[in-house]
Each structure stands twice: as C-alpha cells, then as structure tokens.
Amino acid sequence: MVHVETQKIRNKEQSPRVAELRQELRRKIAAHAPNAGAHATAILGLTLYRRTAPSPCYPAMFEPSLNVFVQGPKRIALAGTTYLCDESTFVLSSIDVPIVSQVVAASEDVPLLSLLLKLDMAVVREILSQEEFHAYDGSSPVRGIAIGKTTVDLLKPCCRLLDLPS
C-alpha cells in the first residue's frame, strides 16, 4: 500500500500589503480572463487561468514554470504526497514533473484564479551560472517542485506583468 501524505502550506498571518497585492492580482486576472479556461497573454509563456467549477482528479505534466494561485484551492499530488494549494501559495517547477491535479472548490462567483509563467531554462541556467551555490547536502527530498507562500516580492512583479500592454 502506498503511503499518501497531505501537506497544506500553513497560511500564517500575512502582511496587509500581501493581502492588498493579492486582491490587485485577482482583479487583474479576472479582467484579463473573464470566462472559464486558460487565457494566453501577449507575454510569451504567461497564461492566466479561471476555473468556475470543481474538477475530478486528472493527470497533468508540470513544465518548468511558476504558478501563482490568488483565489481558490487546488490539490496537487506528486510522489505519494498531496499538497493543498490556495491563494497564499505558489508552485515552482524546475523540470517536467508528472502530477495529479484537482480543482477542489470553484464557482462563477468565486472562481479559482491563477497565473502560470513558463520558465526559459536557458535563461535560468545563465542566471544560476552567475551565482555561487553550495553543494546539495541530501537533507530534503528532491521532487522537482517547490511549494511556498506568496510574498510581496513575488506578487509585485506578477502585478506588473499584467500591467504590460496586451
């Protein structure tokens, strides 16, 4: 039997500025994505998502990307661990990763809203080559994705991306 561990990224009290930026990002995504579905933008690799109904679990492939959730819960399963993502989380994938995904709750009135920015790995490698890193010590599992809490430093550039002309 496979052990399944569920993790929820704890939504500790976040600053009023994080809440304000999240609300601004919600408004911008809702304006650019007025209907359910995936909405390409003028920015190569930037897609906005609006889901208006829960979904069954479905297999998907996470490409190298940054996915920022701003409204609604989504469940992501990877390698025996299930993560519950919500408006306080982001998912960063550095490699192609097979996952199982599910929109947990969404409606016309309160849709799941998120943005996904595909990463150009050649650019990432170039940036990383300019930094000094310590060798991986093996202290944590390597899964190909990282899930964390959104911050002002992440939400501000996301808001600026959606200010660019379409």
Which residues does each PLM region occupy?
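Short flexible/disordered coil segments
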Residues: 21, 105-110, 160-162
